[in-house]
Amino acid sequence: MSNRGDRISSLPDELLCQILSNLPTKNAVTTSILSTRWRSIWLSTPVLDIDIDAFDDATTFVSFASRFLEFSKDSCLHKFKLSVERDDVDMCTIMPWIQDAVNRRIQHLEVDCRFSFHFEAVYLTLYLSETLVSLRLHFVTLHRYEFVSLPNLKVMHLEENIYYCLETLENFISSCPVLEDLTVVRIVDIITEKILRVRSRSLNSLKLVLDSSNGWFIDDIDEWKVIIDAPRLAYLSLKDDQSASFVISNLGSSAKADIKVSFNVNDIWDLPVTFERSNVGKLLTGLSSIRDLTISGTTLMIICHYLKHEPMPQFCNMVRLNARFYDCDLEMLPCVLESCPNLKSLVLGLLSSAETEQQSRVSSVPPCFLSSLEFVEIRSRLCRKRYVMKVARYFAKNSVMLKKFVYVGRVSIQEEDLLALLWRYSICEIEVRGLRR
């Protein structure tokens, strides 16, 4: 063991620093007791990763961080991760640390503040970093500056922040010419601007979250909007129960989307007379070019209401669909599938509604059943066996290209039940699995 320890200690300082860089700074410090050789190695690492919870009090925390930054002030800092969850730390002490990190050509900056108030990022240097590659800010107040330039930023996660005005966030996004990954998490009760615009020619992945689950749901339906124009987008995730309108432009044919929105509808079981159906049409049109779609039961229920009045656009590029359907909307299933003529894979989650199951007939056969649909998975947690078998029978009777049929659920359905339905497809593989809790 000692030989191995000696062998590690004989490595160059640069390599030892690289090894310690993979540890939280507080853990890296513990190596200083190994030997005289290790005593100051941790101070030379290009990473400062500190969490106030790892310290007994705020004074020790501030002293530790200040000592590290002072010792290595002439060297570049590769990564700075700061987690502060107590109000007894003076933000006037913390902000100079961030300014110092930016001045030392930092590449990765993460500030996670959970004060009872928002931490204010007031120094202009943060908005003009030429070296930042990734940036995560949580619970931070961002000021508006006329000029913002982040030429090398590729990953940006902005979570529960306050923006002095709408232009602050828009400028942040538009000032990142090589931005590839963007996450924006907003909370209704701290939002001052209700229209979010994301325009980027470089963006590859976009995740937008707007949460009103804390009870701050606001019924000013026409004001909350999301506008997206990102032609290189490969992945889009929308989790939004507040915005009423979603306008998506130039989405590519290879894109994947995960959609859970409610169009500012507070009760999906009782849509108001004033509900603007055209907002559903706008979202469907914006998504109609994509290849892979996951859609929630809430969103799909509102779409089913829309389809009773308006046609659904064609999703000609769609090959994979993961959708959750309420039993009361079963009659709309063929209508949805008819819009996906080239669908190959369908994962169908069956949900029980608060209403009595309707005795609707599902009889029409979508084109994909006859030409492309090869995989069907039905997932059910609480639905009755009769309902599940009704859906399974629909696919068994009409899907002539089917190669694999999977049932995942708690309803007691045996493989023999499905074999009885699919007996005429000798090449169709059947699988039955229990649903994990």
Curated annotation (Swiss-Prot):
Residues 5-51 form the F-box domain. It comes from the Eukaryota. The keyword Repeat applies. The keyword RNA-binding does not apply. Residues 361-406 form the FBD domain. Keywords: Leucine-rich repeat, Repeat. LRR repeats lie at residues 86-113, 134-160, 161-186, 187-210, 215-240, 272-297, 322-350. This is F-box/FBD/LRR-repeat protein At5g22700. It comes from Arabidopsis thaliana. The lineage of its organism: Eukaryota, Viridiplantae, Streptophyta, Embryophyta, Tracheophyta.
